[in-house]
Amino acid sequence: MSKLKIDTKRRFSLLIALVLIISLSSCATTQTNVTTKTVFNQETTYHNLLKLKKWQANGVIGIIYDNQAESANYTYLQDGDNFSIKLYGPLGIGSIEIKGDTNSVSLANSKGQKLTAKDAKTLMLEQLGWYVPVEGLKYWIKAIAIPNIRQTSELNTNNLLSKLSQNGWSISYSNYQLVDSKYPLPTKIRMSRDNLTLKIVIKSWQI
């Protein structure tokens, strides 16, 4: 009788594991390289990307400022107006997390210290000496311009952004992947303004 109970428990555990595997597989984000032969409809692509409000991007960021160079791994989550950017690795200050919305931003480090401010730029400049333009990043990381703000841009042979100038930033894009068979998203971004340059490599997208 006890053996029957063990077998039943094992079967139940296997069933649960199988259900979890199927669920995770169905939610997995697919990514394929965009070939030079693929040409996208610019208007359709823009509206699809504009409607994309929630994602996670993982990769590496390089920062060049005031004749200094740093790098870090990152995880960037966006959900509507809410965002979270986790930086960790060779940054030299341990791990940090910047999170917030349109009203306030907080920065927490691995020592448990937490600071708040009205905007990310002020907080990051005070603590890091450089900043990520989070207000624009939620558009620029998808390779689209901020709506209703003046900009100049150039397209590549795929009809996707290769260069964008907006809000004082010069942004260039190289390498795209088609995510979930619908969204052409960049994997390499270079952003510069004044004496600050950000080199963003996106290793994976989850949407």
From Swiss-Prot:
Monomer. Plays a critical role in the incorporation of lipoproteins in the outer membrane after they are released by the LolA protein. Belongs to the LolB family. GO terms for cellular component: cell outer membrane. It is a lipid-anchor. The keyword Signal applies. A lipid is attached at C27 (N-palmitoyl cysteine). Residues 1-26 form the signal peptide. GO terms for biological process: lipoprotein localization to outer membrane; protein transport. Disulfide bonds: none annotated. It comes from the Bacteria. A lipid is attached at C27 (S-diacylglycerol cysteine). Gene3D superfamilies: Lipoprotein localisation LolA/LolB/LppX. It is found in: Cell outer membrane. The gene is lolB. Keywords: Cell outer membrane, Chaperone, Lipoprotein, Membrane, Palmitate, Protein transport, Signal, Transport. Pfam families: LolB (PF03550). Its main location: membrane. The keyword Chaperone applies. NCBIfam families: lolB. CDD domains: LolB (cd16326). SUPFAM superfamilies: Prokaryotic lipoproteins and lipoprotein localization factors. This is Outer-membrane lipoprotein LolB.
